[in-house]
Curated annotation (Swiss-Prot):
DNA-dependent RNA polymerase catalyzes the transcription of DNA into RNA using the four ribonucleoside triphosphates as substrates. It is found in: Plastid, Chloroplast. Belongs to the RNA polymerase beta' chain family. RpoC2 subfamily. It comes from Olimarabidopsis pumila. The gene is rpoC2. Binds 1 Zn(2+) ion per subunit. InterPro entries: DNA-dir_RpoC2_beta_pp (IPR012756), RNA_pol_beta''_euk (IPR050254), RNA_pol_Rpb1_3_sf (IPR042102), RNA_pol_Rpb1_4 (IPR007083), RNA_pol_Rpb1_5 (IPR007081), Rpb1_funnel_sf (IPR038120). In plastids the minimal PEP RNA polymerase catalytic core is composed of four subunits: alpha, beta, beta', and beta''. When a (nuclear-encoded) sigma factor is associated with the core the holoenzyme is formed, which can initiate transcription. GO terms for cellular component: chloroplast; DNA-directed RNA polymerase complex; mitochondrion. This is DNA-directed RNA polymerase subunit beta''. Zn(2+) binds at residues 220, 293, 300, 303.
Amino acid sequence: MAERANLVFHNKVIDGTAIKRLISRLIDHFGMAYTSHILDQVKTLGFQQATATSISLGIDDLLTIPSKGWLVQDAEQQSWILEKHHHYGNVHAVEKLRQSIEIWYATSEYLRQEMNPNFRMTDPFNPVHMMSFSGARGNASQVHQLVGMRGLMSDPQGQMIDLPIQSNLREGLSLTEYIISCYGARKGVVDTAVRTSDAGYLTRRLVEVVQHIVVRRTDCGTIRGISVSPRNKNRMMSERIFIQTLIGRVLADDIYIGSRCVAFRNQDLGIGLVNRLITFGTQSISIRTPFTCRSTSWICRLCYGRSPTHGDLVELGEAVGIIAGQSIGEPGTQLTLRTFHTGGVFTGGTAEHVRAPYSGKIKFNEDLVHPTRTRHGHPAFLCYIDLSVIIESEDIIHSVTIPPKSFLLVQNDQYVESEQVIAEIREGTYTFHFKERVRKYIYSDSEGEMHWSTDVSHAPEFTYSNVHLLPKTSHLWILSGGSCGSSLIFFSIHKDQDQMNIPFLSVERKSISSLSVNNDQVSQKVLSSDFADQTKFGIPDYSEFKGNLGTSHYNFIYSAIFHENSDLLAKRRRNRFLIPFQSIQEQEKEFIPHSGISIEIPINGIFRRNSIFAFFDDPRYRRKSSGILKYGTPKADSIIQKADMIEYRGVQKFKTKYEMKVDRFFFIPEEVHILPESSAIMVQNYSIIGVDTRLALNIRSQVGGLIRVERKKKRIELKIFSGDIHFPDKTDKISRHSGILIPPGRGKKNSKESKKFQNWIYVQRITPTKKKFFVLVRPVATYEIADSINLATLFPQDLFREKDNIQLRVFNYILYGNSKPTQGISDTSIQLVRTCLVLNWDQDNKNSSLEEVRAFFVEVSTKGLIRDFIRIGLVKSHISYIRKRNNSRDSGLISADHMNPFYSISPKAGILQQSLRQNHGTIRMFLNRNKESQSLLILSSSNCFRMGPFNHLKYHNVINQSITKNPLITIKNSSGPLGTATQISNFYSFLPLLTYNKISLIKYLKLDNLKYIFQVINSYLIDENGKIFNLDPYSNVVLNPFKLNWYFLHQNYHHNYCEETSTIISLGQLFCENVCIAKKEPHLKSGQVLIVQRDSVVIRSAKPYLATPGAKVHGHYREILYEGDTLVTFIYEKSRSGDITQGLPKVEQVLEVRSIDSISLNLEKRIKGWNKCITRILGIPWGFLIGAELTIVQSRISLVNKIQKVYRSQGVQIHNRHIEIIVRQITSKVLVSEEGMSNVFLPGELIGLLRAERTGRALEESICYRAVLLGITRASLNTQSFISEASFQETARVLAKAALRGRIDWLKGLKENVVLGGVIPAGTGFNKGLVHCSRQHTNILLEKKTKNLSLFEGDMRDILFYHREFCDSAISKSAFSRI
């Protein structure tokens, strides 16, 4: 009884895990027999209690957790806020998806954790609780779905559905939730069956790889070991995993504490010894593993260690390979099935949070951090090195060190509350996530014009296409607007480069036909006073405009200030300036357009290398009608594939430019009508119509032919194909083909139709029904692409004397893809081919650091003529100059540093008439021969002259200009359908004034250098060239500068003058929704400011889309996008590390060594790098041996870690040695390379590493090889036994190959003996199956061998493998980067 009194009494509920530990300790203390007796008693007790309790399970026992209601409500609130942020353009689609998933996953997990305490408190004897939490039936996840919430589902592809199932199975699912639940098909009958078969097949493959691994010796005599340490450079290994790794292993070396040996070599490690070693604080323990065993076809007892069944060293003859395969494959059916995106809660502690220990003010060094965004789109600072963060409170100062590559979530001098998250620590680089690169396409929600608010660079692989890369986080804007049909508007003011064909326009005895308006011909004339009465010049005065437009169609974007019956429609194509080289002649009061070169300047005036500088639309390649383009090399009735195109292969919805090297292309005309969805169509599909047939209410056909009706998103397309219909015979070859071009003279000679084959024809097969078909023979227009445009015809020869600096190259583009339709609204022409000039400089000077040049518009006055020119600055310094004009009061200024000098002043009438007759020119900047002074070179097609260096220049602060009268019609203060006029009250009238320091003025404030008192201007309208136009006809002040800000001053600020200002609004400014101009005023909608008036602003509504660096933007600046067009592509990495979808694909992908993502690719790249570098450093044969061995060690450890990580995340414990046996087999081969041809092995042959070493030593010649990672399937088909391979898969092929090669099977494995009915060489048949030398003889051989070890075999291996650093993959990686 005294003995019993010393025992500790435990009154504790124990679950399945605790029982496992108890049984393990009982076996250690009492042995197997006594333990089984104890467990028998436990079993009997359990059955007795269960019978007495008589637990039954009813639906009433499923109790929903009370806190679920407010948890779900909180999650919905967060999701709603997130949706708002996305709408305002603060987060993009990927960040929204990540955060949404994280919110719901956190809610679901919290509910799961609440479940157990809730049951314990409310109903501890609840049958569901007792069954699931004792481990008898069901698990936490299943009960969570019954009483918590089902949570997030994944679809069959493993993608997360971001709409969670909020109900649980007790409450029942709604219809939507039921469909999502079926779609996910998790934990269902189908899914279980699929998982079971997957896991079974995985087990079969694993067993196939290692079935021949049997314990055949006691000691292989290896001197190597793998070093295990509880802490290393990257991380702390948890004590539990450290103990699990050590127990059951055998020491590879003696362990000393000081000078005392506490454990000796070849001693197996039990729990007592491991605890003692941990207590002593041993830094590193070298153990033997299957990796260090000296044979690949068997294993020794000491390298394997203890048998998991009885706790002693494994017996000879035990088939440990099959046990290993079963151990890894069997848990596959138990794994839970979820998939999550990167981020905190999904991957099991991806990000740890640092919280403030108490309230206080944060202080840190701002120079050591870099502003960035977190994966959820929140602003943060990224630390590059260890950062010390100080938290100051009233009585204490606390310092926290943030490690590198962590996010700091607070600002300097910010006050933080206690327990507030201040930083997020990223995990070390040692972990291996299963990531895959996913593309997320963002589509446009509305129709409009594309605009972006930052510099966007071309993707290098798509230099001349419309795929752009974003260098920094910015917004993409879709400015609202639409394609405007006929009879909607009366007239429009054209701005820069708004090209339009106006077929008919009558204005009181004056007519303008085929007017193509370019540059600022209209804008300068209409908006300057000098042309108020010069209607004879061809510009109508609006007051006497009484004309009507004929059947004109406009194909352009209209802006937000358009409303029905409005007086003014302005098209905004802001900030992209196109100046044409175009001569304008006055002949009988008509403008005659000439096709010329248009120079294209980016928004910020900066050219990068190889950017398109100008383009030329050749009128020969213009078509009035719609049609299809075909090109390639026509050959034997077919079109060969596309030639040398630069095309983005991802999404084909947008218009790409193709750089072509073809000499001809074909245009197949067709008539196209696009109608609204609700239109009444008066023709049937596949019917044949004549000319002038009525198609819809107000549309008639212009050509006859076969009609095709296609219904697309929100519109109907009518296509009319002209041509001949041919009903083919069976003998007709032509009917077999569809969509081909046939050259002249290829028709049937004796037929009546031979005369129609004089030109190229296009044959198209039409199938109205399944049985009937006929062939449509359509006419084709053939275009030959002439030689490239000659630069000498555009510029005089002597202009390019300074060719050392700037080069212009010519490229031809086909603007439409092969077989792509070209659509044009009627009466507008379609340009098929565009010739582009590409700008480059400093070609010969490879070291030139000038990656971009700046282009400016300048005005140059010579002999009274004033011209606008472009200047391209190749020198980084700037030139400023002043030009005097007739009016001595006025002065103009251009400076490169302070503002974007896009700037033009309307000259007097006589000067304008002269300048209109001249061509526009271009100014380029060059360095003179002496490389010291700069000069401007003016390129003009009429004349050229040089202006010398500009020195001693002055400039003023204020630019102003007086215009006597401005006959513009004012815009009404009403909001159109696409724009918003917002009233702005409570501020004083403002005076616009440009200085280099932004100063806001109120009415009575004057500055010293202001000579004239400005009148108060009511409203301004922005112009393309940055001119600000006053819409008040009685005001005589117009300001010129490009950037002009308005400061709205509130009433209570008028005493403080410039000290405090409210919102600044600039013309042309883009801003997101929810920006408030003044207190208690309505929020602005997102858009672009078009007009600023005294009490309101007119905004063109726009939709912002946030995009982060690296996103690919599809489309060009100002391109018209329709609803549903692809706008941007995000490429992001999705992590699926902690979870497994439908069976075991992740473990399987590691074991099959598939390149699933960047991680596996990194491993393969690292292997290749090691092989190259080691060989280069150490030479042959050392390099091959050491390179292969180091590679193999490195990859083995990382593979074991990756597989263990997946299983541990699911709570499945597998001993490392099982995984090591599998990994050893898939990493034991090397590939013979072609670098050094040997007489023994063929290049490309797979051989064992040990065999390669021994053969090389025996032949004394170098064999070139490199390490490879084989998958388990490939390893199964590359064994020493062809019978084993043939019984696995591809039986006929394997046996045929083996017969041809004359292979011999030595029947060493288990499987081949089973197939042939022999004795299995394992277990009791171990000694019968194989003949062995005596034990004593083996030892003698080993001793002799050890004595004769060369330096190469012994010392070198010791140096490389005995120490920890070469075995650890992470350290190997750093060593590789240093090499």
